[in-house]
C-alpha cells in the first residue's frame, strides 16, 4: 500500500496514520470473517484444549470450547500488515518475525495438547524456553548488529538513560520477550481476560512507538529518538484490529480460546515493542495485569516449596478470586479496569520526565 504513494493521487499512503488505519480495518474484517469458520471447523475436529484437572468447577463446562483462535487473529494481523508496511524497514520485519515465530511455538504446544487430549502433552517447559530463546534471538540480533537499536537503559519518569548495557542488552531483551510471552500465557485463563489488557498494552506502546519514531515529537517530549520506529505502529494497529475481531467471539461466554498460539505471540510481541521503544522497565506498568498474574504464581510456588504453605487458594490469582466466590465476569471486568488505569499511568510518563 505504501508503494501506491508513488502515484500522484495516492500520496496520502506515505502517512503512517493512514496505513495504520487501513491495517486496523483489514485485520478486523479478516478476523471477524475467518473466526466463525475456524470455530465451526475446530468443533467438527474436536480441537478443544483439555481443561486443567485442578481448575475451578465452573471451567468443566468449557471442555468443548475450541482453542487455537490465536492462529486466526495473528494470521489476520500479519496479512493486513503485509499490505501496509514498508518492506525496507528492519523494525517492521523483525516485529512480524516475532509475531510469526512465537505463534508457531504456541501452535506446536497447542497441537500436542489437542491431539493427545492431555493438558501436559504440549512442549515441555525446557523445550518451550529453548524455542522462545531462539525466536527472541532471531528477532533481536538483526537490530543489535545493525546498530538501529540503542543498548541504553531508560527508566520511567526520567529523561536520561541510566547506563549503556552494551552486549548484555541482548540477554536483557531476550528476558523481556520471554517474560512477557509467558506472563500473557498465564493470564489467559478466563474469557477475554488476556485480550483486552493486551489491546490496552498495544495501544499504549503504539503511542510510544509513534512519538519516538517522529523526530519532532521525540525531541519535544524528551523521548529516545529512533528513526523508522513508527512503521511498527502499523503492525500494532493491525494486531489491535485482529484482537477486537477475536474478542467478538472470545468475550464471556467464550466461543473460542486463543490458546498458546495466541497468548505466547501476543505476549512476545508486547515484549518486543517494549524493547524497541526503550520501555522495558515501564512494561511492568503497561502490562501490570500480566505482571500481577505472574507474581502470584511465583509467590505461590515459592511459598509452597520453602514453607509448604500456599499464599492463594489457587494461582494464577484470577483462579484465587474464583475460589473465594467472585463470578467470572466480575473478575474479568475488574482486571480490565486495572489494566486501563495502569496504562493511563504509563502514558502519563510521557510528560512527567
From Swiss-Prot:
Swiss-Prot/TrEMBL cofactor(s): Mg(2+)
Compartments reported by the entry: Cell inner membrane
GO biological process: cell division; cell wall organization; peptidoglycan biosynthetic process; regulation of cell shape
Biological or metabolic pathway of the protein: Cell wall biogenesis; peptidoglycan biosynthesis
GO MF: metal ion binding; phospho-N-acetylmuramoyl-pentapeptide-transferase activity; UDP-N-acetylmuramoyl-L-alanyl-D-glutamyl-meso-2,6-diaminopimelyl-D-alanyl-D-alanine:undecaprenyl-phosphate transferase activity
Bilayer disposition of the protein: Multi-pass membrane protein
Sequence intervals crossing the membrane: 22-42, 65-85, 88-108, 129-149, 161-181, 192-212, 228-248, 256-276, 281-301, 330-350
Cellular component, GO, one term: plasma membrane
EC number: 2.7.8.13
Pfam families in UniProt: Glycos_transf_4
Name of the protein: Phospho-N-acetylmuramoyl-pentapeptide-transferase
Recorded name of the encoding gene: mraY
Amino acid at each position: 500500500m505504501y508503494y501506491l504513494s508513488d502515484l500522484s493521487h495516492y500520496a496520502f499512503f506515505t502517512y503512517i496514520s493512514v496505513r495504520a488505519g487501513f491495517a486496523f480495518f483489514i485485520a478486523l474484517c479478516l478476523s471477524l470473517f475467518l473466526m466463525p469458520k475456524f470455530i465451526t471447523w475446530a468443533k467438527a475436529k474436536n480441537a478443544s484444549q483439555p481443561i486443567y484437572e485442578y481448575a475451578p468447577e465452573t471451567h468443566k463446562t468449557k471442555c468443548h470450547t475450541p482453542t487455537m483462535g490465536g492462529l486466526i487473529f495473528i494470521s489476520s494481523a500479519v496479512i493486513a500488515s503485509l499490505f501496509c508496511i514498508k518492506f525496507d524497514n528492519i523494525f517492521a520485519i523483525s516485529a512480524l518475525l516475532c509475531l510469526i515465530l512465537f505463534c508457531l511455538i504456541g501452535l506446536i504446544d497447542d497441537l500436542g495438547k489437542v491431539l493427545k487430549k492431555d493438558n501436559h502433552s504440549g512442549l515441555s517447559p525446557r523445550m518451550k524456553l529453548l524455542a522462545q530463546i531462539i525466536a527472541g534471538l532471531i528477532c533481536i540480533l538483526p537490530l543489535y548488529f545493525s546498530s538501529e537499536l540503542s543498548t541504553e537503559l531508560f527508566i520511567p519518569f526520567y529523561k536520561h538513560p541510566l547506563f549503556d548495557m552494551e552486549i548484555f542488552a541482548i540477554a536483557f531483551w531476550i528476558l523481556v520477550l520471554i517474560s512477557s510471552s509467558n506472563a500473557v500465557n498465564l493470564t489467559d485463563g478466563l474469557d477475554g481476560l488476556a485480550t483486552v489488557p493486551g489491546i490496552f498494552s498495544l495501544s499504549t506502546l503504539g503511542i510510544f512507538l509513534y512519538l519516538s519514531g517522529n523526530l519532532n515529537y521525540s525531541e519535544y517530549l524528551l523521548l529516545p529518538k529512533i528513526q523508522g520506529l513508527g512503521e511498527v505502529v502499523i503492525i500494532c494497529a493491525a494486531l489491535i484490529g485482529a484482537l477486537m475481531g477475536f474478542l467478538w467471539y472470545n468475550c464471556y461466554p467464550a466461543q473460542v480460546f486463543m490458546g498458546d498460539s495466541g497468548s505466547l505471540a501476543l505476549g512476545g510481541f508486547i515484549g518486543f515493542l517494549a524493547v524497541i521503544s526503550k520501555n522495558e522497565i515501564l512494561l511492568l506498568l503497561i502490562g501490570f495485569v500480566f505482571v500481577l498474574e505472574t507474581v502470584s504464581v511465583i509467590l505461590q510456588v515459592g511459598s509452597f516449596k520453602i514453607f509448604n504453605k500456599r499464599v492463594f487458594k489457587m494461582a494464577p490469582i484470577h483462579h484465587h478470586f474464583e475460589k473465594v466466590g467472585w463470578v467470572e465476569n466480575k473478575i474479568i471486568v475488574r482486571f480490565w479496569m486495572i489494566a486501563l488505569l495502569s496504562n493511563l499511568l504509563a502514558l502519563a510518563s510521557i510528560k512527567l520526565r
